[in-house]
C-alpha cells in the first residue's frame, strides 16, 4: 500500500473513531454538538460517510506535508489536526453562534481533534 493511500485510510479510520466516541465526549464535556450529525444534516449514517471522506482528504494532506518536513509523523499529525481546529474554530459560529463562546464546546472540539491526530499519526 502506498504511503498516500495508507494516510488516506488512516485519516478515514480516525474520523470514524471520532464519530463513534462522540456520544461519550458529549456526556463528558456537557456539550451535545455532533460533527457527524451536522455533516449528515441529522442523519448519522450520512454524516459518518462525509466525515470519513473528510478524514481521508486530511490524511492525504498530512501525507503531502510529511513528505516535505523532517519531523516525527505522530507529532506532525497531532499538530496539523490541532492547527486545523484552531484555524477553523471561529467559523463554528456559522453553525451555532453559542458554540463559539462556549469553553465546553471548545474543549470538546480540541479533544476530538487531538484524538483524530493521535490515531492518524499512529496509523499513517
Ranges and model annotations:
Residues 1-124:
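Short amphipathic, positively biased membrane-proximal segments
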